[in-house]
Amino acid sequence: MFIGHFGLALAAKRLAPRTSLGTLLFATEFADLIWPIFLLLGIEHVRVAPGITRMTPLDFYDYPISHSLLALAVCSAVIGGAYYLFTRYTAGAWAVALGIVSHWFLDVVMHRADMPLWPGGPRIGIGLWNSWTAGIAVEILTFTVGIWMYRDFTRPKDAVGRYAVWGLMTLVLFVWIGSLVSGPPPNEKVIACGALSMWIAVPWGWWADKHREIRGA
C-alpha cells in the first residue's frame, strides 16, 4: 500500500478536525518513514527480487520493528499518548494512534505473507500485489475517497490552501505511478534514499492544512 495511506490521513481529518494534516500524514505513514532509516542503519533489510509479486519487485524479508503489528501497536500507544499529553485533544490522540497501527492492516491487504505479527513471529498477507487489477483498484479507491472526504470537509482560505494539498497529492500519485512503471531499483541504499524523500509530505501537509479551514466553522 502506498497512496492508500495518504488517503486515510486525508479522511482522518473528519475524525480530528483540530489535528494538522501533517500530523495525520506522519501517523499513517509512520512505518514507511522510519523504515528507510532502519535500512540505512542496517537494522532492517530488503532485497530486490523481480517477479516476487506483480506490482513490486521488493522482497520485504526483514522489517520486524517498522512493520510488525506488535511494534506498531506499541508506537501507536506511546505516540498517541504523547500527543494527548501535549494537546489534551482526545479525538486527535485517537486519530494519531489509529493512524499508526492502520498502516499494518492496510499493508496486509496488499503484501504477500511478509507482514509480521511481532518480531520473529508469524507473517501474513492477502497478496493483492499479485493482481494488477485488484491492487490498483484498492489503492485508487482508498486514495480517492480520502481526497473527496478532505475536500468536502475543508475549504481553502487562500491560494495556498487551494493548491498546496492537491500539489502534494499529485506528487504522491506520480511517485506511485513511477514505482509501478519503472524498472527494479539497483540496491537497498537507493530504495532507502528514495523512501526517505517522503518525509517531505509531513511539513508540506502541515503547511497546506494551515491554509484551509473546516467548512461551516
Residue positions per predicted region:
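N-terminal membrane-targeting hydrophobic helices
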Residues: M1-A217
